[in-house]
């Protein structure tokens, strides 16, 4: 069963906007050797040059660190350092990291639009990190004056 991705939900009239969810409640639908699948999540799964969210899943009497989040055929796997003792969990995203990635992502789109308009170069790749971002353009025939 696919995982409901909370930050992709309809935004009209929602407060806060689902993109800004920092915490959520969910039920486990699957357990693997080092991961769980939830019925719903606000954790971003790695993809499109953007790193995975990290954070914690909490339940009465315990918590596990979310080390990585991966998406496979609509199912989102949360790789953990410990398995939950409950099927009901409360997820908490590392918001500082997520928000930095959101800002880099938006900046990448702005830069890509400007580079396309001014230089006719398309974005062919990008990678976001916690403290920086990289964007690849093609054709990348910039002169030293262009980059000054």
Model-derived regions, located:
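A glycine- and charged-residue-rich anion-binding loop/surface
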Residues: 1-148
């Amino acid at each position: 069963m696919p995982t409901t991705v909370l930050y992709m939900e309809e935004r009209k009239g929602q407060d806060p906007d689902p993109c800004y969810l920092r915490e959520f409640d969910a039920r486990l639908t699957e357990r693997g050797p080092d991961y769980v699948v939830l019925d719903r999540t606000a954790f971003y799964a790695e993809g499109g040059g953007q790193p995975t969210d990290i954070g914690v899943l909490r339940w009465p009497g315990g918590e596990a660190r979310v080390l990585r989040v991966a998406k496979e055929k609509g199912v989102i796997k949360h790789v953990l350092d410990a398995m939950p003792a409950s099927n009901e969990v409360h997820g908490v995203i590392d918001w500082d990291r997520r928000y930095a990635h959101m800002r880099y992502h938006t900046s990448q789109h702005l830069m890509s639009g400007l580079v396309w308009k001014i230089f006719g170069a398309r974005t062919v790749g990008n990678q976001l990190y916690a403290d920086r971002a990289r964007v690849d353009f093609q054709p990348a025939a910039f002169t030293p004056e262009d980059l000054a």
